[in-house]
Amino acid sequence: MLTAEDFAKIGFWEDTTPEENIVIYGMDFEHTYVTLTDIDGKTPTDEKKSMIMAAYDDNSCFLWFNEFKNFKALQEVCQKAPAESEELFKLFEASSAK
């Protein structure tokens, strides 16, 4: 089972959404941020299931989304660039369903 510590190790913060009352994980970038949920829009807890990453600008306007096959696929992308770097944001954007 995935925990906040697993996500923190690869640079993600943890937050609770007041509307849905679920835990999401996210990462901040310059003028943008991304969030992670499972495919049902809930807290990701199963390392073998797909995860949805959604990107937003500073005004919380939706930019794009990607699907990661599983937690390992997300970890592999995170190892390619520093957390919160522009390079990592571009890698996330280009990494749909890998």
Whereabouts are the PLM-identified features?
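Negatively charged, low-complexity tracts enriched in Asp/Glu with abundant Ser/Thr
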Residues: 1-31
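Short intrinsically disordered terminal tails
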Residues: 1-2, 91-98
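Intrinsic disorder/low-complexity signal
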Residues: 4-5, 13-14, 27, 37, ...
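Charge-rich, solvent-exposed alpha-helical interaction surfaces
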Residues: 6, 73, 77-80, 84-91
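Short, flexible coil/linker elements and helix-boundary hinge sites characteristic
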Residues: 11, 25, 41, 81-82
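Assembly/interface hotspot detector across virion components, adhesins/toxins, and nucleic-acid enzymes
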Residues: 12-13, 66-68, 80
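Intrinsically disordered, low-complexity regulatory segments enriched in Ser/Thr/Pro
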Residues: 32-76
